[in-house]
Amino acid sequence: MLLENIGYDNKSSLLIVKRLITTMYQQNYLIISANDSKQNPFFGYNKNLHSKILSEGFAIIVEIPFYLRLISSLEGAEIVRFYNLRSIHSIFPFLEEKFPHLNYSADILIPYPAHLEILVQTLRYRVKDASYLHLLRFFLHEYSNCNSLIITNKSISIFSKSNPRFFLFLYNSYICEYESIFLFLRNQSSHLRLTSSGVLFERLCLYRKIEHFAEVFANDFPVIPCFLKDPFMHYVRYQGKSILASKDTPLLMNKWKSYLVNLWQCHFDVWSHAASIRINQLSKHSLDFLSYFSSVRRNPAVVRNQMLENSFPLNNAPNKLDTIVPIIPLIGSLAKAKFCNAVGHPISKLTRADLSDFEIINRFLHICRNLSHYYSGSSKKKNMYRIKYILRLSCVKTLARKHKSTARAFLKRVDSEFFQEFFTEEGGFISLIFPRASFALRRLYSGRVWYLDIIFINGLSNHE
């Protein structure tokens, strides 16, 4: 059968998946352990090809109900352009609006399950088909050594790279179960109900699961935390890192901290400790989130008030969210990619010296534009200028090495406008396209701009 479908190495087909599953049930290979898979004739030709086709098709099929539930929930909330919600930059306008009015934040690292069987146990609460769970266990045995008691981070990394779609489905199911319980308690313990909790479209019949939640509370939490009442509690997450912010006292944050640790340990059987959740005061510490350093600072301003014939100044100091480019981690990423050394001095890129001049310049410009696009929301542009300088000089040294010259001599031979694009701002393109653009429009683009077409962190920016 595999020889008949030899052209499906790089694609998934539901027909191929169906035929493979049928063959597996006919030949009864599901009962063979992972240790005997080398002698298994089912895997005799290409074991990875079978597993990849099956798991890809499996992930596609189980994603369909979640996608339909997403569409229905967004239509019910009258959200039309939900594609913009995919952008990670859409988180920052929310932070700008809410965080200046908050006092404390908790940096939360969501722990990975110690064993992949925990993911299966998490899904069994919402999946009633036993064959579904057996097939899921079969995939996990093929991708990892399930005889091991602990799954290391290296094993998880290999597992996620071998089949990212299948891994994301399992991980999102685990996160969904955790957040559904967490936000359910958050809504029950607050004076004000959260209207944004409808985004958790993955929940299956939440209010029909009250009995299950009651069982969780009775077994894991003898006292329901009804005292955790804070209408100014906000929660944001990206991948495995989340932030819990509040306007209340640190006592409430420490109570939520203990609750989360107990939730992971008692309900999900995931080892966690209090050190994984750090509580900081927003006015004194920066948040390392989405490759930005964000902090709340006072923005002093003098406002002149006019009452009848008298006028007098008023000192106003509202809080403002600062988003800063993390220069030291970013230089470390550039050094790892061989654009500079450890202290930020530009060096030539040896692997690109055999390309044409146009290709070398174009690749450096592509990296520079991507970084500028991602860090367009920075409130201070000075750090971004330094990154552009490193990339510009690295490009010059690469070209000079190719032409067997020095950087100074090479710059004298080329036009002064040769590298002008390295210093062109985002707003500079607006001035070139619209020469008569108003001063207000240019001022708008000289400030912070959040782009809703960015759905993942830039590779060089991802220093976490």
Swiss-Prot record:
GO BP term, pick one: tRNA processing
GO cellular component, one term: chloroplast
Places the protein is found: Plastid, Chloroplast
Molecular function via GO: RNA binding
Xref: HAMAP family: MatK
Family according to the record: Belongs to the intron maturase 2 family. MatK subfamily.
Record-given protein name: Maturase K
Coiled-coil ranges (or none): none
